[in-house]
């Protein structure tokens, strides 16, 4: 984008007019959807007023952090902890119940002390956002990862609230898609006050999109908390039930990848059996909980000895029957919020999403645990740190057939944990860099 072009351009003004009209038309459908989801999870409708920006008036201006869901909130946690050291209260906003619950879990003390409020993001239209701004009077806002909400960006600009992308990344795939569109939410990005991004490559992307102030701050996910009880539970199970057995975790496997993933497991298990070798244990963690039942049925149709986490482990991850775990071919990870446990168990992590052109899911958790990683051919969404990790030798980009051949001919752990740890250490310090960038952007 030409930075000399007045913002917003006529194109953007027309897009915003259409966007507001669509919101007015679709709002009843959105509310109906929330009530439908509320049948299973009442939290979708319990705080419906927050979706309209309805809050009691706060006495002090707040720092506003928008973390759409669980992953974004966890990556923001070290930054939030640092910001809580100031006298300014914080409001975190979320689109999903998972993000809100995680904020309430991580910052229980700050919430009870009145230093932090967790709530839903208002619907992305003017009246709801104005009510939210009036209640919290944000000093500035941070949009975690990449969020191009036209209403948020333009209403913040109108109210002169500095708004920044934080831990930002914008994939080549998304840029190519959005450049082909006459109307794209990304065209409102020049309305941001700045962006703090993961790499120099990402900095160039945001500058091309018209964002004036850009700082490279690294990957915040490398600094998120690692739940030590989950790591300790995995260590105990490896010691008591698995000994030196190779463990491979397939995590965040999405719809469209299951058939090939299960074929990989079957081929590898058959090969090791025929060779008279100890078979690896595969841990299979679907991306979406609603798929747990379907995947269980698919595994049951195969010649596997398998079990589910819900049947073999207690709530605090203690083994109910160690002998059953020793004999497993596949452990189905049918639980939420325990990814660090499943990854801590393994020697190698295979991360889904990139095997069916949907874009790979996050690899940072596995790397933080010192695990080498394999991803599918499509890496958009995690171009950083995937490209750097591949160059460093701690990540491989392969299809399922290539991974199968690799596992048949090589040790699963293709690089040492020390090498992975060194890679993560080389990209640390994101929280401090982000704090410095915020100060620079606000007080140039």
Briefly describe each language-model feature range.
Residues 2-444:
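Nucleotide-activated sugar donor-binding and catalytic core shared by glycosyltransferases
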């Amino acid at each position: 984008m030409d930075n000399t072009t007045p913002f917003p351009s006529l194109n953007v003004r027309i897009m915003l007019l259409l966007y507001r009209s669509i919101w007015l038309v679709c709002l009843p459908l959105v509310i109906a959807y929330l009530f439908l989801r509320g049948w299973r999870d009442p939290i979708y409708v319990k705080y419906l007023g927050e979706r309209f920006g309805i809050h009691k008036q706060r006495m002090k201006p707040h720092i506003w952090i928008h973390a759409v869901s669980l992953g974004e909130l966890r990556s923001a946690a070290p930054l939030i902890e640092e910001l809580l050291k100031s006298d300014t209260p914080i409001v975190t906003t979320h689109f999903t119940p998972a993000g809100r619950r995680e904020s309430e879990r991580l910052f229980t003390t700050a919430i009870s002390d009145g230093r932090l409020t967790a709530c839903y993001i208002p619907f992305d239209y003017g009246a709801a956002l104005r009510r939210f701004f009036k209640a919290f009077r944000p000093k500035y806002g941070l949009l975690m990862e990449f969020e191009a909400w036209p209403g948020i960006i333009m209403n913040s600009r109108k109210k002169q609230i500095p708004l920044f992308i934080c831990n930002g990344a914008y994939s080549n795939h998304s840029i190519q898609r959005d450049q082909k569109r006459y109307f794209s939410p990304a065209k409102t990005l020049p309305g941001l006050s700045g962006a703090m991004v993961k790499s120099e490559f990402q900095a160039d992307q945001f500058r091309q999109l018209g964002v004036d102030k850009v700082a490279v701050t690294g990957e915040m996910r490398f600094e998120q908390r690692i739940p030590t009880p989950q790591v300790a539970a995995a260590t105990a199970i490896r010691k008591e039930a698995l000994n030196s057995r190779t463990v491979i975790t397939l995590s965040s496997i999405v719809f469209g990848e299951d058939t090939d993933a299960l074929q990989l497991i079957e081929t590898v298990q058959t090969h090791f059996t025929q060779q008279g070798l100890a078979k690896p244990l595969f841990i299979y963690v679907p991306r979406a909980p609603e798929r747990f039942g379907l995947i269980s049925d698919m595994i049951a149709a195969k010649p596997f000895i398998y079990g589910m986490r819900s049947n073999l482990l207690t709530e605090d991850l203690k083994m109910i029957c160690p002998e059953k775990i020793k004999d497993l071919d596949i452990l189905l990870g049918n639980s939420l919020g325990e990814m660090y446990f499943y990854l801590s168990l393994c020697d190698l992590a295979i991360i889904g999403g990139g095997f069916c052109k949907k874009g790979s899911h996050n690899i940072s958790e596995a790397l933080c645990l010192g695990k080498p990683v394999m991803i599918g051919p499509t890496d958009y969404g995690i171009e950083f740190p995937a490209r750097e990790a591949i160059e460093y030798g701690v990540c491989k980009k392969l299809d399922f057939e290539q991974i199968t051949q690799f596992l048949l001919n090589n040790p699963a752990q293709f690089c040492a944990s020390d090498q992975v740890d060194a890679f993560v250490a080389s990209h640390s310090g994101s929280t401090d860099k982000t704090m410095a960038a915020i100060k620079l952007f606000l007080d140039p």
